[in-house]
Amino acid sequence: MVKLFSFLLLVWVASPAFSSEFLKASGSNFYYGGQKVFLSGVNFAWRSYGSDFGNGQYASNGPALKDWINKVKASGGNTARVWVHVEGQVSPAFDSHGFVTSTDSKKTLINDLSDLLDYANGQNVFLILVLFNGALQNNSNVQNLFWDESKLNSYINNALTPMVNALKSKPSLAAWEVLNEPEGTLQPGSDQNSCYDTSTLAAQGAGWGGKKFPMKQILKTINWISSAIHNADSKALVTVGSWSELTQTDSFGYRNHYKDSCLTGAGGKSNGIINFYQMHTYSHSGKWNQNAPFKVNRWAYNVNDKPLLIGEFASVCSQNEGIQNLYKYAYNNGYNGALTWQFNSGGDCSDTYSNQMYGMQALKGQNDQSGGKGGMVSVNIN
């Protein structure tokens, strides 16, 4: 009996200490604890661009990020979108030949992210961790991950998989985002396969950050990274943040380049798909695109198999609806979340953090579980 007890104790100690609850995507909604959830929050993006985590940088940036989490909670929000590698300034660590050797040279990245996730957990705030920036990508080592399978595998094996394994027990980890706005470095071009044909996007401004990658290479990279995440953590949610509605729907004559068939066709890995859609939206000259998220309801996009998050928006680049009305519109028109840009208040189309706090207050405590409504906002993460 003593030996049996000792064996059972050993098994219990060696077992992953998973929480009983994690954010889930089912059909067109997010769920937590059996309740439909609306991700109401902000983009932290970064405090120090590309240098918030890893190589000891978190010591100077972590306190500010935690203060921002406090502000999200105080305003009634529940989610923040946080950028990790960005353009590879600090992480991952590359050798002289461009192969990834580890998460970062001082190997602090995982502990940094773990600490922030634990803090967010205590404040009932979910974090979406964004791996790379596709709007701008000037690091040749990161660029080569899109072209060289052996280098991409070195990232997957030596940085990504260790991160996912170390963090998969964190209930505040809402999702992994492979790329922010990959259309920024898209090389528009024609292709017989509609998944890869982006010829119509050239006139829409795609490639503003430098025309570096054809769509097929982007989709293959997303497919491989998503597959690796799902291999390490089958329950993980994965997404991609598109610059607009133009590339994540087949409605209105557009093309959904990130649907399952396009991703698996490009990369060949059946589990290398995204678990929810994510559109970014800003007005131009004070006008929304006619089919922008704040002009139509989510059902108009016909992507009803997965949740749909408005991953970036700002009241200063809207049609003067007011930030609280924008949050309410998303909540009442079938969207599964809305995140303002951006809490450090830097750059164009960025609301002040005080205005973003005011915006989140519009949905504080909301919990409408009826059809077409957002669901629960005040989430008790445990």
Swiss-Prot record:
Name the UniProt record assigns to this protein: Mannan endo-1,4-beta-mannosidase
GO biological process: mannan catabolic process
pH dependence: Optimum pH is 3.5. Maintains more than 50% of the maximum activity at pH 2.5-6.0. Not active at a pH above 7.0.
Disulfide bonds: C195-C262, C317-C349
Activity regulation details: Activated particularly by Ca(2+) and Zn(2+), and to a lesser extent by Na(+), K(+), Mg(2+) and Cu(2+). Activation effect of the divalent metal ions Ca(2+), Zn(2+), Mg(2+) and Cu(2+) is reduced significantly by the addition of EDTA. Strongly inhibited by Mn(2+), Hg(2+) and Ag(+).
Positions bound to substrate: 83, 144, 147-151, 180, 187, 204, 208, 243, 282, 284, 341, 348
Biological role stated in the UniProt entry: Hydrolyzes 1,4-beta linked polysaccharide backbones of mannans. Has high activity toward locust bean gum. Also active toward konjac and beta-1,4-mannan. Hydrolyzes mannotetraose (M4) and mannopentaose (M5) to mannobiose (M2) and mannotriose (M3) with a little production of mannose (M1). Hydrolyzes beta-1,4-mannan to M2, M3 and M4. Hardly hydrolyzes M2 and M3. Does not hydrolyze p-nitrophenyl-beta-D-mannopyranoside, gua-gum, carboxymethyl cellulose, soluble starch or laminarin.
Database matches in PANTHER family: ENDO-BETA-1,4-MANNANASE (PTHR37398), GLYCOSIDE HYDROLASE FAMILY 5 DOMAIN-CONTAINING PROTEIN (PTHR37398:SF3)
E.C. number: 3.2.1.78
Consequence recorded when altering H284A: Slight reduction in substrate affinity and minor reduction in substrate turnover compared to the wild-type
Keyword set, alphabetical order: Carbohydrate metabolism, Disulfide bond, Glycosidase, Hydrolase, Polysaccharide degradation, Secreted, Signal
Effect of W341F: 2-fold reduction in substrate affinity and 10-fold reduction in substrate turnover compared to the wild-type
Reaction(s) the record says it catalyses: Random hydrolysis of (1->4)-beta-D-mannosidic linkages in mannans, galactomannans and glucomannans
InterPro entries per record: Glycoside_hydrolase_SF
Chief subcellular location: secreted
One GO CC term, this protein: extracellular region
Subcellular location: Secreted
Spans annotated as Involved in stabilization of the transition state: 346-350
A GO term for molecular function: polysaccharide binding
Active site: E181 (proton donor/acceptor), E312 (nucleophile)
Organism: Cryptopygus antarcticus
Biotechnology: Potential use in mannan-hydrolysis industries which need especially low temperature and an acidic condition such as the food and the animal feed industries.
Record text on subunit structure and interactions: Monomer.
